[in-house]
Regions:
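Short beta-strand-initiation
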Residues: 5-6, 163
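Cysteine-centered motifs
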Residues: 14-17
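C-terminal structured interaction module
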Residues: 216-245
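Serine residues within intrinsically disordered or low-complexity segments
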Residues: 9-12
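Soluble ligand-binding/transfer domains with enclosed cavities or grooves
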Residues: 28-210, 214-220, 231
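Low-complexity, intrinsically disordered or signal/transmembrane-proximal segments
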Residues: 6, 22-24
């Protein structure tokens, strides 16, 4: 029987997801390997400032600019998700996705303590790791990497070679990331996910709240299924006095 050593079995993935140390084994190489991200042939740093343009960039609060500045790629934010919810279709999709990784939290709840870790990858990308502490469960870890595509546009690398193409813009002092396509990246080949398939359009908002804190809100909405996922929470800057526990 022909084997494919680069593919994980369902059993190994399940064991991997339940590893107590998973959320603490964090460095650029391991995260890139988990997300099957190949180092870029021509590394280029993700610059939100460049993607937005100077006018839009300086319309954002100074604290938002500091969090997304080119030199600010390493930080740890602590806070709480006031709400993590999903529709029936969303919960089903999240549970199925646990066989290939965890692109979205598979559980729901309110007032969920969480930690967000951000750090740079060797090829200029920015890795994001969200650790949810649902009551009575092992920490749930969701990872992704924002990086530039071959064409210089912004994408987010998710588990199982899934990629999400993103538009980024600023409006009324809020930073927005909105998906415009999903595709699987297999080497140099791309297989686009049809627009009518789940999950739908992902919309992330970064809202500065002042006093060293911000709100993260994510909505995923499908054209037919409606709202599939919704998360919102407040987090504190590492330098904020209230960040220490």
């Amino acid at each position: 029987m022909r084997t494919f050593p680069h593919l994980l079995s369902a059993r190994s993935v399940c064991n991997f997801c339940l590893d107590r140390n998973y959320g603490h084994n964090m460095n650029a190489s391991t995260v890139m390997a988990r997300l099957r991200v190949r180092p870029a042939d021509h590394p280029a740093s993700v610059s939100v400032r460049t993607l937005l343009g100077e006018t839009a960039w300086f319309s954002l609060p100074a604290t938002t600019r500091a969090r997304f500045a080119d030199h600010a790629a390493s930080a740890e934010y602590r806070g709480e998700f006031a709400e993590v919810r999903a529709s029936f279709a969303g919960r089903l999709l999240a549970m199925c996705c646990r066989l290939i990784g965890t692109p979205v939290a598979p559980f729901t709840g309110t007032n969920i303590p969480a930690t967000v870790k951000v750090f740079a990858t060797p090829d200029g990308g920015t890795a994001w790791q969200r650790i949810y502490e649902f009551p009575g469960r092992e920490p749930c870890v969701v990872e992704s990497i924002k990086r530039l595509s071959r064409e210089g546009t912004l994408i987010e690398a998710l588990p199982a070679c899934l990629r999400m193409a993103l538009d980024v813009y600023a409006r009324d002092g809020v930073l927005h990331f909105v998906s415009n396509a999903y595709y699987f990246e297999l080497g140099r080949m791309r297989i686009r996910v049809l627009d009518w398939l789940p999950p739908g359009t992902t919309h992330v908002e970064h809202i500065d709240l002042g006093n060293g804190s911000f709100r993260f809100t994510m909505r995923v909405r499908h054209r037919w299924l409606g709202e599939v996922f919704y998360q919102t929470g407040c987090f504190r800057d590492p330098a904020s006095p209230s960040a220490s526990r």
